[in-house]
Amino acid sequence: MRSYPNAAQGLKLLFIAEIVAIVAAVLSLVPVVGAILYIVGLVLVLVGLHKAGADDAGYKTAFTISIVNLVVGVISGFTGGVIGTILSIVSIILDLIVVYYVVNTTANLARSRGDSELGAKGEKVWKLYLACAVINVVASLLSFIPVLAAVLAIVLLVVQIIAYILYLIFLNKAPKTLA
């Protein structure tokens, strides 16, 4: 049975990056600290995907899409109005594609190592992330209707928290299976 040490190490970095992102969000009120932690998390994601890409092309695709999303995010930061909304939706879709490649590639590698349970968890994580993306896009498009947008924002928050926790659990378990 083949092991995937680069994927395991890369996924560990992705897990750490997600923890750093949580800390960055909590410390976002401290402008410099939050921004630095956000950048550290972003670098860890890119390094993790690049490292994992040595074991499977799915991670390489996720890496490339992450770079494209970074560019879209920078451009989006300098635009507003309709263009900003469109770029925001594009970024949501690109994030979803990255999660798709990370989760499905990892699930497939886990199955190849005989861990069908982790593979099934990956499918569940992916479906929740897809639901989050759909709700997020709909909320973005309906942002001009405040009451509806507020309801969707609450639903989105609940689903995102569940999806994020399951994603973290998935990222934490995957390196043990793939190593």
Model-derived regions: residue spans:
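Membrane-interface extramembranous regions at the lipid-water interface
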Residues: 1-25, 38-78, 93-139, 159-179
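Short hydrophobic membrane-inserting alpha-helices and related fusion/pore-forming segments
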Residues: 26-37, 76-91, 139-156
